[in-house]
Amino acid sequence: AAHELRDENGAFRGVVHRDISPHNILIGTNGDVKLVDFGVARSVGRVSEATRAGQLKGKFGYMSPEQARGKAIDRRSDLFALGIVLFELTTSRRLFRGESDIETLKLVISSRIPRPSSFDPKYPPELERIVQKALERDPAQRYQTAAELEHDLRSYLKAERIVVPQGGIASLLKRVVGSRIEQRRRAVRGALKSLAAGMSL
């Protein structure tokens, strides 16, 4: 949705998150998935200014090649980052991880991107096509919008008859971390009560 934001004249703002990674993708207790931490997000114009100043923002292992080079970026850079997340989510392997930040950046810029099927021969071909397209080094060959990526993913799920029932993710979260969530809620309620009591003195 952020990619589609427009200004008061109806022109696209060109928002780029610049820090899409597993750390910034949260699942709410109701099952909704949220992208958070827009602290380093910029419009295209401001991204160019930051790039000229030589500033690299974001987690190195989830940068696009153009971002790692310090070049101007647009929303397609975010889609490369989503491709990394999708690759790691479906292979349980890190894609770019060097011994140092510099080594990681070098891997992002020039290392060969392996096919998911090289780790799992049974990896679905259509899902691999989607992942590989998101991870195209040339932005022009990559998905151009998040809507295109979403369309292909939904089509894949439909073709494979993979259905997540409404409330299914929320139910899974409740089973896995429900007790921990409730503990935190109780702790917050207790802290708020203590704060309110202190303010009333």
Report residues per predicted region.
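Conserved catalytic-loop position in the HRD/HxD motif
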Residues: 19
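Hydrophobic "anchor" residues on beta-strands that sit immediately upstream
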Residues: 15, 33, 74
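Protein kinase catalytic-loop region centered on the HRD/HxD motif
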Residues: 1-15
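Activation-loop N-terminal segment of eukaryotic-like protein kinases
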Residues: 9-10, 27-31
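C-terminal lobe helix-coil module of Hanks-type protein kinase domains
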Residues: 23-28, 36, 59-199
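Regulatory activation segment
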Residues: 33, 46-57
